C-alpha cells in the first residue's frame, strides 16, 4: 500500500517534532517535509503535492487559512487537517467551507489526533477501493469523513496556555524526571494550583502519568512523570 505523504506546517520546532513522533506510530503515513513559514509551505506544497497537510494557522509570515485558500485556488487534490490554537468561529467556519478534513484546537489530546489520522487513513483507503461506487460506499465515505459520535473529547481545561503547556511537557523529556505541583510551581513561578492544572492536563492528554507517593512523614503526594519521550527543542 502506498504511504500517505504528509507535510507538517508548524513554526514551533518542538511541536513539529512531537507531531512527527506521533505520526511515526502510523506506518501508513510518511512525513515528507516540515515548513515553519507560509512561504516555505507554499513551496513544499507545489514541489511535493502531499496527500495530507497538518497545518497551524498562526505562522510568522501569515495565516494558515491563506494556505488553504491557495490550495483550493490551485486545485490541490490532498486534504488538510488544521491543528491550531485559533478557536475563533470565523476561522473555523471558513475552514469548514474550504473543505478541511478536521479541525483540532491546541493543546491537542493525543487520542484525538490518533483518531483523526485513523479516520483519514480509512477515508483514503475507501476512496481507492474501486473506480465506481454504490450508495452504500458513498454513505461510508461521508460517515468516515464526519466525526463519529464515539470520538474522544479534546477540550482542554480552562486557563491552559499552549506555550506554557509545551514548556511543562519539555521538562519531562528525560523519562527519569519527576515533578510535583510544588516543584513545578517553583519552576514556572506560579501558584501550586496553576502548576497542578498543567500537570493534570498532561495526564488527561496521555503525555504524563501520576502516582501517589508517601513522603517521609507518610503524607501522600501526587507525583508526575513522562509517559512518552519528547524530543529536545533544536
Curated annotation (Swiss-Prot):
The keyword ATP-binding does not apply. InterPro entries: 2C-system_Tx_regulators (IPR051271), CheY-like_superfamily (IPR011006), DpiA-like_HTH (IPR048714), Sig_transdc_resp-reg_cit/mal (IPR024187), Sig_transdc_resp-reg_receiver (IPR001789). Disulfide bonds: none annotated. The keyword Phosphoprotein applies. Keywords: Activator, Cytoplasm, DNA-binding, Phosphoprotein, Transcription, Transcription regulation, Two-component regulatory system. Coiled coil: none annotated. Residues 5-121 form the Response regulatory domain. Gene3D superfamilies: 3.40.50.2300. Phosphorylated by CitA. GO terms for cellular component: cytoplasm. PROSITE patterns: RESPONSE_REGULATORY (PS50110). GO terms for molecular function: DNA binding; DNA-binding transcription factor activity; phosphorelay response regulator activity. It comes from the Bacteria. PANTHER family: TRANSCRIPTIONAL REGULATORY PROTEIN DCUR-RELATED, TRANSCRIPTIONAL REGULATORY PROTEIN DPIA. Member of the two-component regulatory system CitA/CitB essential for expression of citrate-specific fermentation genes. Phosphorylated CitB binds to two sites in the citS-citC intergenic region where it probably activates transcription of both genes. In vitro CitB and the CitA kinase domain form a complex, formation of which is enhanced by ATP. This is Transcriptional regulatory protein CitB. The lineage of its organism: Bacteria, Pseudomonadati, Pseudomonadota, Gammaproteobacteria, Enterobacterales.
